[in-house]
Amino acid sequence: MNALAATNRNFRHASRILGLDSKLEKSLLIPFREIKVECTIPKDDGSLATYVGFRVQHDNARGPMKGGIRYHPEVDPDEVNALAQLMTWKTAVVDIPYGGAKGGIGCTPKDLSMSELERLTRVFTQKIHDLIGTHTDVPAPDMGTNAQTMAWILDEYSKFHGHSPAVVTGKPIALGGSLGREAATGRGVVFATEALLAQHGKSIKGLTFVIQGFGNVGSWVARLIGERGGKIIAVSDVTGAVKNQNGLDIVDLLRHKEETGCLTNFSGGDHMDPNELLTHECDVLIPCALGGVLNKENAADVKAKFIIEAANHPTDPEADEILSKKGGVILPDIYANAGGVTVSYFEWVQNIQGFMWEEEKVNNELQKYMTKAFHNIKAMCQSHNCSLRMGAFTLAVNRVACATTLRGWEA
């Protein structure tokens, strides 16, 4: 089951729990707007190349639409649609005043020079500038994009609309970015993990962790868990996997990856088959990479009691069912990885106010939002006798449905 089908399934289940009528359910499911554009740019060698870009604006009942822009060869309308819808529920779960959107361009960033990436970004912005905006749709970085990409979008957009720092988030600090944004998704994952463990009478200290993915999110998760006394016994990324039952030294591992570009040949651990990482014995498993990694083929062999979905859609519905029957506790992606969009909201607020927060304030506010959201999810679970995933979806769908009804849009 692909990401769109799984997201729709979760939404419909939440709708049934809430007793939404079919007309309202349909209006919440259909995207507000789907945009497809062709972006033709001159390459460095003088040839022309055309790339297809997408922006799906799913819902704006609770506020401006919010979501990343990814540059990846496998970007397609279904994936963008699913991720846009997921952003609607994600922003609603943590109760920030946004709806959901997502965008992307089908390209391979590593095959493009910096100047080609800049031209592509500016052309894409020219095509969609009148459909995004501070109070309309606010993009952010995603897979294959970064703060520099946002700087180009900001600059190109400002040519048409004047200086508009709040039109994108995840910007460089010098252009209005927020302190704490780089670590925000990973830090949010850790705050979410702490909230879940506390509910089970546990803490991070002394537990064993396995982390799949060691990019921005995974590396920050590892660093922050290590600081709290957690024992990270295995880590993987696209270059390989490394384990140490006594605990990996994350500072050394980060230094090794920075120097070599990979996890392999790390002296502080042993090589392991990346395919065995997800089923490695541990207390807490944190997938931080791609979707669909936990499926019906490997779910029965997963040994972790707690699974924290730092990636988007890492668990197939079939795996979800298998893991739940085994007594596994899954913290769903629409909550667990919402730290990034929450601090994006803080950045947007700072830009509108023209007043920058200290990093300590950013982190403290993030902890408040993540902790409060967890307690709201648990309350939904208790009210409807459902899983954490359905508690999160039910909470989110109910908030969006209420806003939609109050606006009179459901008819």
Curated annotation (Swiss-Prot):
GO terms for biological process: amino acid metabolic process. Its EC number is 1.4.1.3. It catalyses: L-glutamate + NAD(+) + H2O = 2-oxoglutarate + NH4(+) + NADH + H(+); L-glutamate + NADP(+) + H2O = 2-oxoglutarate + NH4(+) + NADPH + H(+). Keywords: NAD, Oxidoreductase. One of its GO terms (molecular function) is glutamate dehydrogenase (NAD+) activity. Signal peptide: none annotated. SUPFAM superfamilies: Aminoacid dehydrogenase-like, N-terminal domain, NAD(P)-binding Rossmann-fold domains. Gene3D superfamilies: Leucine Dehydrogenase, chain A, domain 1, NAD(P)-binding Rossmann-like Domain. It holds the Pfam family ELFV_dehydrog_N. InterPro entries: Aminoacid_DH-like_N_sf (IPR046346), Glu/Leu/Phe/Val/Trp_DH (IPR006095), Glu/Leu/Phe/Val/Trp_DH_C (IPR006096), Glu/Leu/Phe/Val/Trp_DH_dimer (IPR006097), Glu/Leu/Phe/Val_DH_AS (IPR033524), Glu_DH (IPR014362), NAD(P)-bd_dom_sf (IPR036291), NAD_bind_Glu_DH (IPR033922). It comes from the Eukaryota. The active site is at K102. The keyword Oxidoreductase applies. The keyword Ribonucleoprotein does not apply. Belongs to the Glu/Leu/Phe/Val dehydrogenases family. This is Glutamate dehydrogenase. The lineage of its organism: Eukaryota, Viridiplantae, Streptophyta, Embryophyta, Tracheophyta.
